[in-house]
Amino acid sequence: MNKVLITGATGQTASYLVEYILKNHPEYEIHCTRRWRSREENIESFKDKVIWHDVEMKDYFNVFGVMNKIRPDRVFIYSASSYVRDSWAQPWIYMEENVSHAMHVFNSVLMINNIDFETLQVKLDYNPKIFVALSSEEYGKVPWGTQLTEDSPLAPSSPYGVSKVALDLMAKVMYESY
């Protein structure tokens, strides 16, 4: 059976993804992460239909433990601090959380594959597809009606946007390197 891991599944966007997969891909075993303090209003429709893992995504060993235990075929990283206005008050939290959550997933895959950190050689016996949730905030303030593509210039205008650009670039580096 194919396994999917969705981090931050109690959030608005990730909860829609869970509902979509449940409806359209019943062949998937769905694993979701949540924090002990997660609000549950977005998950009422599927709370008992998925396998929950209480994970603090800032804690690498928590993330590694879940990744190593279930070895998902696909990982959707939605866990993040996502309030643009609040990012101005605590920009370091946004940078740390929004990048480290994904880095812990990436590094878990490398560790499961026994990467040699001296030579950076890794034999990818376990190679899940990893999807990272990004944001239009990466492009900053653009004129109304402007069509954005992945090739549009990155010009974040908030600490939250900067954290998502850093995440975007790190995901690209990891993809191209491994």
Task: Put a short name on every predicted segment.
Residues 1-178:
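N-terminal Rossmann-like NAD(P)+-binding domain of SDR-like oxidoreductases, especially those catalyzing
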